[in-house]
A protein has these predicted regions:
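Bacterial N-terminal signal peptides that target proteins for export
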Residues: 1-7
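C-terminal motif of bacterial Sec signal peptides marking the signal peptidase cleavage site
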Residues: 14-18
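N-terminal leader/targeting segments and the immediate start of mature chains
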Residues: 19-65, 179, 184-187
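Non-transmembrane domains of secretory- and envelope-associated proteins
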Residues: 20-22, 138-187
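A general "mature secreted/periplasmic domain" signal
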Residues: 33, 52-63, 68-73, 79, ...
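Extended beta-sheet lipid-handling architectures
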Residues: 44-48, 59-64, 77, 89-93, ...
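An acidic-aromatic
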Residues: 73-125
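Charged, gly/pro-rich active-site loop segments
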Residues: 121-140
Length: 187
């Protein structure tokens, strides 16, 4: 039961992390040539980042791998133990899927549905900035604090150097061996 709680806290922190970010990763202003600015990368991979979730009662640290295809799809793999993926979050600009591999369950939701339960809201651009180390806080570390219910949750991510334009594995996880649950049961 205690492990369930860790998964929920880490999942909530990861999904809420971009809530306060307002800076865009890519400028929407035309460049000197009059064309919109194009991102400097197509794929991005950050391996073995350290994500730490701190609550009033607990502290949980896990390795996180973030794989992104620009404006298309991203995968966040949470591995508290070396090489064992325990939680996976797959996202597209329209949908989020959280997969709990330990308990054999998953939940799907849209950003609109998720934002009915979260305050402030979360969007694709903010999540993509988190997964590519393009946050206004810099490429080395991100730190956020939230109120979730009556509990304060703090998330600290320490990034390793990112690799761009490398092959990434962002194929959808086959969900037929998992049981679908409502996202509200996790949040």
């Amino acid at each position: 039961m205690r492990f369930d709680r860790y998964i929920v806290i880490l999942l909530a922190a990861i999904l809420m992390v971009g809530c306060g970010v307002k800076k865009k990763a890519v400028s929407e202003q035309p460049s000197a040539t009059g064309k919109p600015e194009v991102p400097a990368w197509h794929t991005c991979l950050i391996q073995n980042a350290r994500a730490t979730v701190i609550t009033d009662e607990d502290r949980l640290t896990a390795n996180v791998t973030m794989q992104t295809v620009h404006d298309s799809m991203l995968v966040i793999s949470i591995m508290p133990m070396l090489g064992m993926e325990m939680l996976r979050v797959e996202a597209t600009p329209m949908e989020l899927t959280a997969i709990d591999k330990i308990h054999g369950r998953y939940a799907k939701t849209t950003f609109a549905e998720l934002n009915k339960r979260l305050t402030p809201s979360l969007n694709w651009d903010e999540l993509q900035q988190l997964c590519t180390a393009e946050l206004p806080t810099g490429e080395e570390r991100a730190r956020y604090a939230y109120i979730f219910g009556e509990q304060t949750i703090e998330l600290v991510i320490e990034y390793n150097p990112r690799k761009t334009d490398v092959p990434v594995r962002v194929m959808n996880q086959k969900l037929d061996k998992y049981t679908q649950v409502d996202i509200s049961k996790w949040l």
